[in-house]
C-alpha cells in the first residue's frame, strides 16, 4: 500500500468539495499540501458526446439509476470531476428565509447563507437567459401557468456562452455550464491544490483515508498510479454526496457515537409528466429548464419545473408499456414535459446504511402526505398542459393511460391516490439531502453549523448531506454556501489543525 501525506484532504469535487477546494486555495498557495480525491473521471472535451446511455454510464453512479431498498425510487447523482455540477441544469436559487428558520440550527442564519449564495451566483455567472434561449417547452409552461393564475418565475442559470444544445443532464458539450469543473476546481489547481480523479475513498481512520485508484478506461488517467493508498491528513473534509458521505462515515471507525448518522435523508421525490400537443413542439433546442412554479409549495407541498429529457429517460418514466406507450414515444416530438418535486419531511427512518460489502443502501418510505402531494402535482400539471393547448395528457396516477382534452375538467376525478401505485410508476430524485445533518449536538445531528463532526475536531462534512431538512428549492447554490462556511472554519482553525 502506497503512502501519501497532506495537510488537508477533501473527498469529492462537486458543489461542496469544489467550493471548499477553491476557498482553501490560498493555503495551498502559501505552501500547505491540499488534495481533492474524486471517485469519478475527468473527461476530455471530446468525450462529451451527448449520447444518452454513454454519458449516463460515464458521469452518473449506476448510470443514474441507483435504486432504493424498497425499489420505489431511483436516485440520480454524478460521479465525475465536478460531481453532480457536471450533469446539473444549472438552476441557481437562494434558499428562502423561512426554510432556514424552520431548520433551527444554532449558529446558522439566513443572512449569512444568502450573502454567500449571492457571491457564488456572481462567481458562476448566474443570470436570466435571454428570450431567444427559452424554447417552446418552457414558453408553453409559462403560458399555461399564467392562464391559470399560477405564480411562475424564470430560473437564473449558471452558464456562459450557452448554445442551447439542451444536453445539460448529459454534461454540456459546449463547455458553457459553470459547474465546479469549470470554475472552482481550475482555480484551486492553479493555486497548487492537487485533484486526484478515479480515486475512491473506502474508509477513514484516525486522520487518514484508505483509497483505491482505478482508471475506468475513459477520461484522463488519474494523477496517481492504480492501486491502494493510505493518505494521511491533518484535516479531512468529506463532500461525497448525501449517499456517499454517510456511507463513508458508516464504513469508518469514528471515535464517537453518532446515532443520527445516515438518518433524516430527504430527496424531493420527482415525476416526469408529459402532455401531447397536436403539432410538433420545438423543445430540443434552447435551455431545458427555464421556469418554475412554487404556487403550491406552501399549500400542497410541491414544486413544478420545466424539463426536457431524452428518449431512454422519457420511456422509463412513462407508466405502463405496450401499444399506448409505444404510440406516445413515437410522438415524442409533440411532447411538453413538466417535472414535479414533492417537498418531503426529514424522517429518521429515511436513511443511508451500508451492506455487508460496505456499499450504500438508501431506505426511503413515502409518507401519505408526500403521496398526496404527488397526486396534487399531477392534477396541477394536467391543468397546465391543457391550458397550454395539449390534446391529451399522460398521468401515472390516472385510471387510464391518456386523459383527453375533452375530460380536462375531470382531472381531479381521474387522477387519484387510489391509482398511484408505488413500484408501478417511475419516481426519481436528483436532490439528495441529509444523512450528516447539521444541528446542536450528537443526539440528533452529525455536525455543528460549520460542518465539524461532533467530537472529531479534524473531520468536517461539506455537501448536501449537511442539510437538516428539505431545502424546498433546487439546493445547488445552498450546498456551495454551506461548504463555504466549512472552508472558512478550516481556515480559521488552520493554526491549530495544520500544526506540524
Place the predicted regions along the sequence by residue.
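Rossmann-like flavin
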Residues: 81, 85-162, 365
